[in-house]
Design a protein with these regions (language model features):
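N-terminal secretion-targeting helices of virulence/extracellular proteins
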Residues: 1-90
Length: 90
């Protein structure tokens, strides 16, 4: 017998919070990238090169997270709807 072991409303709230978080993260990343670009005009030693590579790698990882979690949000909302439909049938 199938069971619903999640509160659909909690799932919806999480999906909405994830969407907000992704938006905030994208805005922060854009701002930080602009500041880092400006910093590159005055910081040009070996440490800058090392940090720039780490920074770039981290930004790529964060972009992949945002892409993945942006796909998960709608999935979670559909799942919440299916669970709610299932619970109404009981």
């Amino acid at each position: 017998m199938a069971k619903a072991i999640v509160d659909p409303e909690e799932l919806r709230r999480f999906a909405e919070e994830l969407k907000r978080f992704n938006g905030d993260l994208q805005n922060s990343m854009s701002s930080l990238q602009a500041r880092f670009g400006a910093l590159s005009d005055t910081w040009q030693d070996q440490e800058h090169l090392k940090f720039a590579q780490d920074f770039t790698d981290t930004m790529k990882t964060l972009r992949r997270f945002i892409e993945s979690s942006n796909q998960q949000g709608p999935f979670l909302l559909r799942k919440a709807q299916r669970i709610e439909d299932y619970l109404r049938q009981r």
